[in-house]
Amino acid sequence: MIRKSKKITKMRGSRTCGYGEAKKHRGAGHRGGRGNAGHQKHKWLSVCKFNPDYFGKYGFNRNPCLIKQLETINIGELEEYILKYKDAFQVEDGKVVVDATTIGYEKVLGKGRISTAMVVKAVEFSEGAKEKIEAAGGEFVEL
């Protein structure tokens, strides 16, 4: 087992114990403050050299009224919903009529597979959803 003596034991008798002048070991005065203190005053040149992007704002936040946030559902999930609650939907010409807004969705997305022919009504459709609905023998109606 290695027996290592502590630094302070080695430094006994050296008056300042490795801290140079005695007053350099008091507080944070020797290093110009703790942490980022003085970065807009006496340490400004080091900020300019090593961290020039520390201060200032960059980019922007869009106004929330400009961001369109629609409730979405994938076409595969919609078919699962239809199969689960068959009695809640009307059938016209062999196609199930689904109004997505009545079940709380505004946009239909194209993830998943469908085999049921359906007429889907929604505010918006993705291109993939349109293709899959038509491929299954259904149609889409944008409100």
Swiss-Prot record:
State the GO CC annotations: cytosolic large ribosomal subunit
Q: Which residues form a coiled coil?
A: none
Pfam families named among the record's database cross-references: Ribosomal_L27A
The Gene Ontology biological process terms listed for this entry are: translation
| Molecular function, one GO term | structural constituent of ribosome
Here the segments flagged for biased composition (Basic residues) are 1-13, 23-38
Keyword annotations: Ribonucleoprotein, Ribosomal protein, RNA-binding, rRNA-binding
Sorted alphabetically, which InterPro entries does this protein's record hold?
Answer: Rbsml_uL15_N (IPR027386), Ribosomal_uL15 (IPR030878), Ribosomal_uL15/eL18 (IPR021131), Ribosomal_uL15/eL18_sf (IPR036227), Ribosomal_uL15_CS (IPR001196)
Disordered: annotated span? 1-38
* Family according to the record: Belongs to the universal ribosomal protein uL15 family.
* Role description: Binds to the 23S rRNA.
Report the HAMAP family cross-referenced here.
Ribosomal_uL15
Subunit-level organization: Part of the 50S ribosomal subunit.
What this protein is called in its record is: Large ribosomal subunit protein uL15
